[in-house]
């Protein structure tokens, strides 16, 4: 166990609840693109923390509140990402609870309906071979969303003040996916 355990600095190094819910927050549009599962030892951590702080101020100045970002469509996107990553089953409790806070009803049938059309794309422990930080280095949530974008609502708003579709296009234009290829 000592040699094969799931070692990590930060959140769990497997697709447990903490890792899954970071990914769900980003998939809902509530985190900056590409920031979920950033390893605690990453040189980019401070930069992304500053960007998140600046973006929080921008969101307040522009009155872009979570209730203007989180919709049924954004939950459907998150559930599709959940299927693609084979996320923690605890999400079946957490996502409906979060949705309820926004006046949105999600139940097991919602997961079942959306998961039936989804593809499993990840090889992350415990169902797969690799630790969770590899997901981050391989492009994280944006890479998964790019792969399944035909199944997503690209018109949903995000914390960037742009739609999901605009975020994915900007990442592609800026070469985000190019730096991730060596991990895929």
Positions of PLM-derived features:
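Catalytic or ion-coupling anion/metal-binding cores of large enzyme and transporter domains
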Residues: 1-184
């Amino acid at each position: 166990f000592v040699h094969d355990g799931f070692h990590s600095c930060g959140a769990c190094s497997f697709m447990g609840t903490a890792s899954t819910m970071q990914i769900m927050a980003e998939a809902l549009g509530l985190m900056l693109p590409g920031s979920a599962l950033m390893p605690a030892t990453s040189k980019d951590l401070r930069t992304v923390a500053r960007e998140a702080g600046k973006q929080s101020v921008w969101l307040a100045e522009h009155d872009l509140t979570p209730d203007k970002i989180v919709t049924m469509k954004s939950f459907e996107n998150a559930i599709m990402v959940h299927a693609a990553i084979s996320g923690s089953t605890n999400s079946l409790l957490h996502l409906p609870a979060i949705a309820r806070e926004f006046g949105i009803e999600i139940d097991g049938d919602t997961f079942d309906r959306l998961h039936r059309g989804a593809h499993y794309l990840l090889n992350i422990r415990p169902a797969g071979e690799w630790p969770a930080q590899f997901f981050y280095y391989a492009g994280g949530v944006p890479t998964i969303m790019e792969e399944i974008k035909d199944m997503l609502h690209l018109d949903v708003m995000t914390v960037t003040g742009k739609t999901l579709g605009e975020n994915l296009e900007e990442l592609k234009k800026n070469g985000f996916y190019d730096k991730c290829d060596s991990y895929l």
